[in-house]
Each structure stands twice: as structure tokens, then as C-alpha cells.
Design a protein with these regions (language model features):
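Amphipathic, hydrophobic secondary-structure cores in small proteins
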Residues: 5, 25-31
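Short, low-complexity, polybasic intrinsically disordered segments
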Residues: 41-52
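Phosphate/pyrophosphate-binding loops at sites that engage ATP/ADP/AMP, CoA/4′-phosphopantetheine
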Residues: 16-25
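Cys/His-enriched microdomains
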Residues: 71, 87, 105
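Extended interfacial segments that mediate partner engagement and assembly in macromolecular machines
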Residues: 2-15, 39-41, 55-63, 67, ...
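Short functional micro-motifs and their immediate structural scaffolds
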Residues: 81, 94-98
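Short cysteine-rich clusters marking metal-coordination/redox-active sites
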Residues: 73-76, 89-92
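Short, flexible, mixed-charge glycine/proline-rich loop motifs
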Residues: 61-69, 78-83
Length: 123
């Protein structure tokens, strides 16, 4: 289960962002993940909440934005969004496609309470 490893690294990034922006508590964060990462959102949420106990992110709301796989056909130039891992052009059926989206895995934003009020930080 690589979700626990991702959650642990995510919590490290959140702690760094909180320190950098003088946040005493993190209330919400947004994580963007591509379909090619094979991350199970429910497993990641469970790991995040379990590993986050006792950290600056304890009780924070984790928003996961899932990015579908998108490809461009090198034969006809069409762009398609894939529903599964069949890397075929949606227009002409060619196998020669380039992945445009779906590899993402990044912390997009962090929101929390500053030591003297409220604040927000970009990941």
C-alpha cells in the first residue's frame, strides 16, 4: 500500500508549508493526483488521517482532486480522455499516443490558522 508512504510525505510537505507561512494549525489541503498513479483515494485518506494525528494537520480536511488520463494521438492529432488504461486514440483508434495528463501528484494548496489569525499557503 503506497498510500501510507504518500500520506507520510504529504504530511512532511504540509509541516514545511505550515512552518514557512507561520501556520499553527492546518484546516484544509488540496492534493492533485493523476489516474496513472494508481492511488486509492479512500486508502490515502485513511492513511493521512491516521498518520496525521498529533501533527499540525491533525483534523485537517483533505481534498483529493483526481485527474483523468488524457492523451494526444500522434497519428491524427486528436486529444482524448481515457476511461481505462487502454492507450488508444479515441478518434482513430491508433496506438501511437502521448500522455498529456494523468501523471500528476502534488500538493496544490494548504489553508490554516496563522499564529495570529487565519491564512493560506500555496503548496
Amino acid at each position: 500500500m503506497h498510500e501510507l508512504s504518500i500520506a507520510t510525505q504529504l504530511l512532511e510537505l504540509v509541516a514545511e508549508a505550515a512552518a514557512r507561512h507561520n501556520l499553527r494549525r492546518v484546516n484544509r489541503l488540496r492534493l492533485v493526483i493523476g489516474a496513472l498513479g494508481n492511488v486509492v483515494p479512500e486508502a490515502l485518506e485513511f492513511a493521512f488521517y491516521a498518520a496525521g494525528e498529533g501533527t499540525v494537520a491533525a483534523g485537517a480536511r483533505l481534498e483529493i482532486v483526481q485527474v483523468p488520463i488524457a492523451v494526444r494521438c500522434n497519428a491524427c492529432g486528436a486529444e482524448s480522455t481515457l476511461e481505462d488504461f487502454a492507450f488508444l486514440c479515441g478518434a482513430c483508434g491508433a496506438l501511437d499516443v502521448e500522455v498529456l495528463r494523468g501523471n500528476e501528484l502534488y500538493l496544490d494548496s494548504v489553508e490554516g490558522e496563522e499564529n495570529n489569525g487565519t491564512g493560506a499557503a500555496d503548496g
